[in-house]
UniProtKB/Swiss-Prot annotation:
Subcellular localization: Cytoplasm; Cell membrane
Designated name of the protein: PX domain-containing protein kinase-like protein
Comp. bias intervals (Pro residues): 515-531
Domain named WH2: residues: 548-567
InterPro entries hit by this protein: Kinase-like_dom_sf, MONaKA_PX, Prot_kinase_dom, PX_dom, PX_dom_sf, SortingNexin/PXDomain-PKLike, WH2_dom
Length: 582
């Protein structure tokens, strides 16, 4: 079986869903304007970063381009006089940073081509509309029956996927949509298997999968034609949008959104799950479910864009499920994405963040139960249910589907094996990315905790306690060392001093074993009548501090016990205190 693990040599396949972060690091004032130096980073690796220089006019141009969204973005206002003042520049720099933060926090805006070109001009300088037109023109040379009516500009969210309204020359009233897409970072099929599978898509027949009229592929891209649907997608229904409008205008800040009725949620949800189950049973990887990839045909939902996984394109929700290590298969990705779709169908908008801590009131508790099983903290932490499990839940189990169309999609055994290996490679890249994000998050939390005010206070308290403890230990060691030195000098011992914690064993082994720990010494005898030239070993020395060494104490006690009064010499006293008379 032909199989390719790496993209073609010389071709860089970027994952456009990897978030970009931007930090305005500094500013530099030139003669007539100020430039802002911005550090841009792709993903979590600081090594994958670069600097760009932008003027305020560049930000203003970007902001004007984003007005199509209808969002009120916090771009700092213009200032003609005093705009070179140092304090003003610092304030504007903070404002521009906040502006970038707001844009990058928006899931739709952060993936749009306008922002990518602003932050990463080296990788997004190509005109993909022109590239797509060239590819389509080459296709028309061999297929002259098709004709382009007009380009459908930016109706999708993908940067490297373009759409054109088409017609057949001998059927001028029938409208079709041609989609052209470049390869993505998860393209692991060989060129031969890739082209065969793309051409196999028109043979896929299922009541809940949108039919492909024509499909072909080259070594670097794919081109598919489908019937144009005036009503648009399920997302168009929810957002009250026109299918031909640009993606940013339709979905970024809709004025009117409306959740669906309970019966619609049940029916559409069941239809989508049946389509997913069919693909899973066939071993065909999907991973691209979202409301704009579900065509609404009357009262029937049909999945779109089966070719995306063959092209290796990243999922719309990839930046969400890469945060959760338990969502590590394409089947679990489909279930998680279904949770996003169900949330939009229920509440008329996407969730503010994922995982969802608490769900707003819904038309049925059965809806909330499915949402909790796919979007809650517990579900994201422990893993997704299967599609079969969702079909058995009360929300969908009692839905009756009536269709006369028999599903069929015959995939040759050789291509099934190619799909299986490609699916494993896609899941492997996902798992590795999740692992890197998890490790980065742990490191970031540790650094944040280490640098927090509470942690700094705790470390100061511990340092003070340790310092006090060391001071107390040092003060206790000083008299012990002093007594050891005095004792060694008084007894004439030649052995070196030792610390109290590790006493040196005595030189005579029998003494330490024969003598138990001695009792306190008895009170000294009364002082003699006069001075005596006795040696120090024959006289008690009560003025010496009690030594802690067991050998010295034993010697002192033995000297006291063996003392004999008779060994003292008699002394004659001459009393000169009487008065002299003479």
């Amino acid at each position: 079986m032909a199989f390719m693990e790496k993209p073609p040599a010389g071709k860089v396949l970027l994952d456009d869903t990897v978030p970009l972060t931007a930090a305005v690091e500094a500013s530099q004032s030139l003669q007539s304007h100020t430039e802002y130096i911005i550090r841009v980073q792709r993903g979590i690796s600081a090594e994958n970063s670069w600097q760009i220089v932008r003027r305020y006019s560049d930000f203003d141009l970007l902001n004007n381009s984003l007005q199509i969204t209808g969002l009120s973005l916090p771009l700092p206002p213009k200032k003609l006089i005093g705009n070179m003042d140092r304090e003003f520049i610092a304030e504007r720099q903070r404002g521009l940073q906040n502006y970038l933060n707001v844009i990058m926090a928006n899931h739709v805006l952060s993936n749009c081509e306008l922002l990518k070109k602003f932050l990463d001009p080296n990788n997004y300088s190509a005109n993909y509309t022109e590239i797509a037109l060239q590819q389509v023109s080459m296709f028309f040379r061999s297929e002259p029956k098709w004709e382009v009516v007009e380009p459908l500009k930016d109706i999708g969210w993908r940067i490297r996927k373009k759409y054109f309204l088409m017609k057949i020359k001998n059927q001028p009233k029938e409208r079709l949509v041609l989609s052209w897409a470049d390869l993505g970072p998860d393209k692991y099929l060989s060129d031969k298997d890739f082209q065969c599978l793309i051409k196999l898509l028109p043979s896929c027949v299922h009541p809940y999968i949108y039919r492909v009229t024509f499909a072909t592929a080259s070594e670097s891209s794919a081109l598919l034609i489908r019937a144009f649907n005036e009503k648009g997608t399920l997302k168009d229904l929810i957002y009250k949008a026109k299918p031909k409008d640009p993606f940013l205008k339709k979905y970024c800040n809709p004025k009117k959104t409306q959740g669906l009725e309970l019966q619609q949620i049940k029916t559409y949800g069941r239809q989508i799950l049946e389509a997913l189950k069919f693909l899973h049973d066939k071993g065909f990887p999907y991973g691209h479910l979202h409301a704009a990839n579900v065509m609404l045909d009357g009262n029937t939902c049909r999945l779109l864009d089966l070719e995306n996984s063959l092209l290796g394109l990243p999922s719309f929700y990839r930046s969400y499920f890469t945060q959760f290590r338990k969502i590590n298969t394409l089947e679990s990705v489909d279930v998680h994405c279904f949770g996003h779709l169900l949330y939009e169908m229920t509440y008329g908008r996407p969730p503010d963040s994922v995982p969802v801590d608490s769900f707003p009131p819904a038309s049925s508790l059965a809806v909330v139960a499915v949402l909790e099983s796919t979007l809650s903290c517990e579900a994201c932490k422990n893993g997704m249910p299967t599609v079969s499990r969702l079909l058995q839940m009360p929300l969908f189990s009692d839905v009756l589907l009536t269709t006369s169309e028999k599903p069929q999609f015959k995939i040759p055994t050789k291509l099934k094996e190619a799909l299986r290996i490609a699916k494993e490679c896609i899941e492997k890249r996902l798992t590795e990315e999740q692992k890197q994000i998890h490790q980065h998050r742990r490191l970031t939390r540790a650094q944040s905790h280490h640098g927090s005010e509470e942690e700094r206070k705790r470390r100061k308290i511990l340092a003070r306690k340790k310092s006090k403890r060391s001071a107390v230990e040092n003060s206790e060691e000083q008299p012990v060392k002093h007594s050891n030195s005095n004792n060694s000098a008084g007894s004439g011992a030649s052995s070196p001093l030792t610390s109290p914690s590790s006493p040196t064993p005595p030189s005579t082994a029998g003494l330490s074993s024969a003598l138990p720990p001695p009792p306190p010494p008895p009170p000294p005898p009364p002082p003699p009548a006069g001075p005596s030239p006795t040696s120090a070993t024959e006289m008690p020395a009560p003025f010496l501090p009690q030594p802690v060494n067991g050998v010295n104490r034993g010697a002192l006690l033995s000297s006291i016990q063996n003392f004999q009064k008779g060994t003292l010499r008699k002394a004659q006293t001459c009393d000169h205190s009487a008065p002299k008379i003479g």
